[in-house]
């Protein structure tokens, strides 16, 4: 069993989550945009997470969030679960929506780390073969 994720109150994170088999399940569309925005807003409100930025690409998403109350795991579980259920239903799918590994959460210690994650995220992802 892996060690529990260390989640500290007040930490800012770069969170990334991939779709199963890197499928393009988050392709831009009105449904994807509406579902992701709505669920992200509800999850942030429910768990008190501050969303600074996000980027949804065709097969994964990035979030830059601050977690004042160490609620990141519950926030992510809620976000991922509802996005998967809604988009699977809209696509007529029943398979796993997200990759089997957990989300990635990298602590952003300095303001420079936050700016770097915001400016390099999509560019770095698009340069990966």
Regions found by a protein language model. Name each.
Residues 1-129:
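Short catalytic/metal-binding and nucleic-acid-binding patches
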């Amino acid at each position: 069993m892996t060690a529990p994720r260390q989640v500290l109150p007040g930490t800012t994170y770069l969170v990334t989550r991939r779709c199963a088999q890197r499928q393009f399940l988050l392709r831009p569309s009105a449904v994807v945009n509406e579902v992701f925005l709505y669920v992200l807003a509800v999850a942030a409100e429910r768990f008190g997470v501050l969303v600074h930025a996000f980027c949804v690409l065709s097969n994964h998403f990035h979030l830059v969030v601050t977690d004042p109350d160490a609620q990141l795991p519950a926030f992510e579980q809620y976000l991922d679960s509802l996005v998967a259920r809604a988009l699977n239903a809209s696509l007529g799918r029943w398979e796993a929506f997200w990759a089997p590994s957990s989300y990635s959460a990298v602590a952003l210690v300095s303001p420079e780390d936050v700016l770097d994650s915001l400016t390099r995220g999509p560019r770095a992802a698009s340069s990966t073969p």
